[in-house]
Each structure stands twice: as C-alpha cells, then as structure tokens.
Amino acid sequence: MFLGEYRHTIDEKGRMIVPAKFREHLGTPFVITRGLDNCLFVYPQSEWDKLESQLKELPFTKKDARAFTRFFFSGASECELDKQGRMNVPQPLREYAKLEKECVVIGVSNRMEVWSKTLWEDYVSQSEDSFADIAENLIDFDL
C-alpha cells in the first residue's frame, strides 16, 4: 500500500528518486501515466493490469469512454527503477504535470502520484476547507 507524502526533485534528465518505502510496492516494471488534476499516476504492474481490464470494458461507442481511454493510455509508459532507485519521467508527462525541479510524491492506496510542488500546495490549500463536506458526501461509515 502506498501512504504518505514526500518531497523530491527531478534532475535535468527527468530522473526522480522514488521514496524507499514505495520501491518494494512498485516492483518492476511499473506504469506511469497522466493522472487527473494535472498529476501523474504511477501503478505497479498488477494494479495497472486490473485497471486496464476495467477500462477495456467501457463501451467504445460512448464518446466519453473513448476520450478517457485515449487520454489515459496514450500517456502511459512502462518504467523500471535504476540502481539508485530513480525512475525516468518522460518529457511529455513532465510537461503535462508541470514538473520542473521540485515535486511531491504521495501515496494513494494502490498507486503513487507525482505532483508539481506548486500544484500540490495549491490543491491542498483549496481542498482542506472542503474535506469534511467531501467525506460526508462520499463515505457511508464513521471514521
């Protein structure tokens, strides 16, 4: 399971150190793709396979299904960690997520997300006030 928030940097070649706690869960290979909210989603191969199966079931006759699967799969790239525990973030994905030098890596249960430091701070700032309302609308059990 992926949990926590970590601050990292991306070098000029697009390499980023993956938090040590996440490396074992990621395995090799793993998949990185465009996520929602201008972040990147990083999935272990087993989780990617589950998601791929679900998305393949969407009706291709539906415009939204075609748009989403195109967006999601066209940005996907299979990756491996190097000996230093770094992953290479492809240039188109760095551009999509507005990744420059500083980034934030967060754990979200079955996936890892990579955010621009600025976008993450903005997202947290905007979401903090509405967290209780979101929880009330989505969760049917007491925390």
From Swiss-Prot:
Keywords: Cytoplasm, DNA-binding, Repeat, Transcription, Transcription regulation. One of its GO terms (cellular component) is nucleoid. GO terms for molecular function: DNA-binding transcription factor activity; transcription cis-regulatory region binding. Disulfide bonds: none annotated. Pfam families: MraZ. Residues 5-47, 76-119 form the SpoVT-AbrB domain. It is found in: Cytoplasm, Nucleoid. PANTHER family: TRANSCRIPTIONAL REGULATOR MRAZ (PTHR34701:SF1). Forms oligomers. NCBIfam families: division/cell wall cluster transcriptional repressor MraZ. Belongs to the MraZ family. This is Transcriptional regulator MraZ. It comes from Shouchella clausii (strain KSM-K16). The lineage of its organism: Bacteria, Bacillati, Bacillota, Bacilli, Bacillales.
